[in-house]
Structure formats: structure tokens, C-alpha cells
């Protein structure tokens, strides 16, 4: 939400973020929450606090069933620590991977950069972060009883797709990039709605969604 993460504004502390978001969520009965990327841990936390009727993770790590959850994986933390300036301030997220073209392509930054106006608008909504912000963690209450689904937008999250299938979640594969929600919002919305229908129906079967079949993407090979 741009009003919460405006450029040059530090977001709430990681451990306080889900509580902060509660103030901006319109109360509704058993909502289904959607979290992209690192927000996967936030929706798991919110799913218990609300409580939620279900959650969908889009191209993010699947949080532990309970216990400590950090903003990023340790390997990424090491990468970004080296990019902090003398005061510990990081460049905006989209510039973390400027020297890694392969990673930038998996994220979709190369495609976004083809439109300088769109890139500038995108970066203007990104917060300026201090490296110490990423040292925080949240303690998740047990949430694995909440119905959940997973949308894989990029190959970055092959491991998360495998974990979702192991847990018996419905999974959609979009064959895009990490920024698929930004670059292809209609396609992403279709996949979300397809999973919502499955969660509403209470189907516990592990399967690929209609969104995956319609785009001719890979099938479940388990």
C-alpha cells in the first residue's frame, strides 16, 4: 500500500508490521489473505490474529508452521548487508540486483526497466530501509490449520512450490517473474481467484489450478 510504504519512509518494525496492518484492514468475516514475497510471513501472522478463512502465498517462502520468521533468508541478508552505505542505509529494493543480470531477469526488473516512467513510479513506492531492520523477527503462532494455497510466479521459488505440494496445498504455476503481480496483474488476479474458489470449496486435494492449465504451463509431476 503506497500510503504505508511511501518513498523515504521507513516501514514499521518487522515484528510490529502485522499489528500495524490490522489498523488498515476492513473487518470482514473469515477473509482470505494474499501475501507476495516476504509478506508470506505477515499473512501467516495475520491469519491467526484476525482470524482468516484462508491464505494464499504468491512467490514467497512458506513460513514455518510456528516459531521464528525473519524478513529474508540468511543468504539474501548477507547479500544486501554488503550494499549498505556507511550509515547502514540500503538502496531501494529494485537496485539490490543491478550487478546480477540473471537474478534481475528472474525478478522481472529487466522488463520493468524497459519503461523508465513505470520503473520510476514503481521505485517511488519503495521504502528506504536500514540494514538493521532485517535483523528483526516475528514469532508465529501455529497457523498450519488455516487453509492455504500457493502461486509460483518465478523459478526463484521452486523450493516453495515443492513445500506447498508436500503440505497438500493447491498450487498454481504462472511461468513468469517475481514481479508478475506488477507486470501481469490480470493473470495474477485470475490465479488468486481460482485458488480462492478452491479454498472456499474446502478441497484438500493437491492439484494445479485452472489458471495453470489455461496458460499451458507445467503439470504436477509428483
Regions inferred by a protein language model and the residue ranges of each:
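Catalytic active-site module of serine/aspartate enzymes centered on a nucleophile-bearing elbow/loop
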Residues: 176-222
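Conserved serine/cysteine hydrolase catalytic core
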Residues: 126-186, 199
Amino acid at each position: 500500500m503506497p500510503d504505508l510504504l511511501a518513498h523515504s519512509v521507513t516501514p514499521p518494525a518487522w515484528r510490529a508490521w502485522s499489528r500495524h496492518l490490522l489498523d488498515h484492514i476492513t473487518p470482514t468475516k473469515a477473509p482470505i489473505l494474499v501475501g507476495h514475497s516476504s509478506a508470506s510471513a505477515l499473512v501467516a501472522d495475520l491469519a491467526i490474529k484476525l482470524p482468516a478463512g484462508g491464505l494464499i502465498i504468491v512467490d514467497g517462502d512458506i513460513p514455518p508452521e510456528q516459531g521464528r520468521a525473519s524478513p529474508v533468508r540468511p543468504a539474501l541478508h548477507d547479500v544486501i548487508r554488503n550494499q549498505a552505505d556507511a550509515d547502514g542505509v540500503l538502496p531501494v529494493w529494485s537496485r539490490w540486483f543491478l550487478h546480477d543480470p540473471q537474478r534481475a531477469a528472474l525478478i522481472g526488473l529487466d522488463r520493468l526497466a524497459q519503461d523508465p516512467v513505470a520503473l520510476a513510479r514503481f521505485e517511488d513506492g519503495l521504502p528506504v530501509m536500514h540494514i538493521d531492520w532485517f535483523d528483526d523477527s516475528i514469532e508465529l503462532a501455529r497457523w498450519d490449520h488455516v487453509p492455504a494455497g500457493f502461486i509460483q510466479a518465478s523459478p526463484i521459488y521452486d523450493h516453495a512450490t515443492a513445500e506447498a505440494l508436500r503440505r497438500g496445498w493447491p498450487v498454481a504455476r504462472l511461468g513468469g517473474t517475481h514481479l508478475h503481480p506488477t507486470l501481469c496483474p490480470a493473470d495474477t488476479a485470475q490465479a488468486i481467484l481460482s485458488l480462492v474458489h478452491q479454498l472456499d470449496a474446502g478441497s484438500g486435494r493437491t492439484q494445479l489450478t485452472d489458471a495453470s492449465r489455461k496458460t499451458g504451463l507445467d503439470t504436477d509431476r509428483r
